[in-house]
Amino acid sequence: MKDFITVGQIINTHGLKGELKVYPLTDDINRFKELKSVYVEGILKNITGCKLQSKKVILKIEGIDSIEKALEYKGKYLEVSRENAVKLEEGRYFIVDIVGCRVIDEEGVFYGKISEVIHTHRNDVYWIKGDNELLIPAIENVVLKVDVEKQEIIIKPVETWM
């Protein structure tokens, strides 16, 4: 498992004093209010201000005091260390831990690896890429077991879903 969890991407500057507009990559934008620091390209940066704006976050980071300096960060990702990440309930996983998992069914048939997790209103959907591409609903009666340590997800055989 990775040591860092990506929580957002800097998409632009905000204002003239070095604030950063961030696209959140977390399911709860309010988590940004609790952050004291983030890593940008492996370097720890202290957060001195946070505002929520629609579906974006405006962050003020120590040492970034001008629009010119802020522009240097455009496109970069914000990460938190795994030990400082939010604690998940049992049966919930970070997307970073799901992407790349092998997907097999109960009979051992290999379907491919998860390339992306798509969020929908009802449930997440796993996009599997192998010999073919397959979208799998991340629901209890399809996904039987998730083992992020083994990087393996076991599902019911596709033909039994109907």
Swiss-Prot record:
**Record keywords: Chaperone included?**
yes
Q: What are the record's GO terms for cellular component?
A: cytoplasm; ribosome
Q: What molecular function does GO assign, one term? A: ribosome binding
According to the entry, every stretch annotated as the PRC barrel domain falls at: 89-161
Q: Which coarse location class describes where this protein primarily resides?
A: cytoplasm
Q: Which UniProt keywords apply?
A: Chaperone, Cytoplasm, Ribosome biogenesis, rRNA processing
The family database entries (Pfam families) matched by this protein are listed as: PRC_RimM, RimM
Question: Which superkingdom is the protein from?
Answer: Bacteria
Where can this protein be found? Cytoplasm
InterPro entries, per the entry: PRC_barrel-like_sf, PRC_RimM, RimM, RimM_N, RimM_N_sf, Transl_B-barrel_sf
Gene Ontology BP terms: ribosomal small subunit biogenesis; rRNA processing
The UniProt subunit note reads as follows: Binds ribosomal protein uS19.
The free-text domain note is:
The PRC barrel domain binds ribosomal protein uS19.
Q: Which PANTHER family match?
A: RIBOSOME MATURATION FACTOR RIMM
- Its function? An accessory protein needed during the final step in the assembly of 30S ribosomal subunit, possibly for assembly of the head region. Essential for efficient processing of 16S rRNA. May be needed both before and after RbfA during the maturation of 16S rRNA. It has affinity for free ribosomal 30S subunits but not for 70S ribosomes.
| Family affiliation | Belongs to the RimM family.
Q: What is this protein called?
A: Ribosome maturation factor RimM
Q: Which organism is it from?
A: Clostridium kluyveri (strain ATCC 8527 / DSM 555 / NBRC 12016 / NCIMB 10680 / K1)
Q: Please name the gene that encodes this protein.
A: rimM
